[in-house]
């Protein structure tokens, strides 16, 4: 039991000594908060896109190449 007490006291002393070196000074944070601004034309088009804006992509077939394999694997 005596060894256990010594180890705990050494760990507490080490934490106390290390806390003096590790602590940092906190700085104030300034937020840019001001009065609410009235926007004449809201820009809702970027926030919620319409379904008409979607672009349809052409999907290429995944079948074999009819003209042959231009770069066949190397045989060793």
Curated annotation (Swiss-Prot):
Hydroxyproline: residues carrying this PTM: 61, 64
Gene label: CLE46
TM ranges: none
Name of the protein this chain belongs to: CLAVATA3/ESR (CLE)-related protein 46
Domain of life: Eukaryota
List of glycosylated residues: 64
Family: Belongs to the CLV3/ESR signal peptide family.
Keyword Glycoprotein recorded: yes
Positions of region (Disordered): 53-76
GO CC, alphabetical: extracellular region
């Amino acid at each position: 039991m005596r060894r256990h007490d010594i180890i705990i006291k050494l760990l507490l002393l080490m934490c106390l000594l290390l806390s003096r070196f590790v602590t940092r000074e906190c700085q104030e944070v300034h937020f840019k908060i001001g009065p609410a601004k009235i926007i004449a034309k809201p820009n809702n088009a970027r926030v919620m896109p319409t379904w008409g804006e979607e672009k349809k992509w052409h999907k290429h077939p995944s079948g074999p190449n009819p003209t042959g394999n231009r770069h066949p694997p190397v045989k060793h």
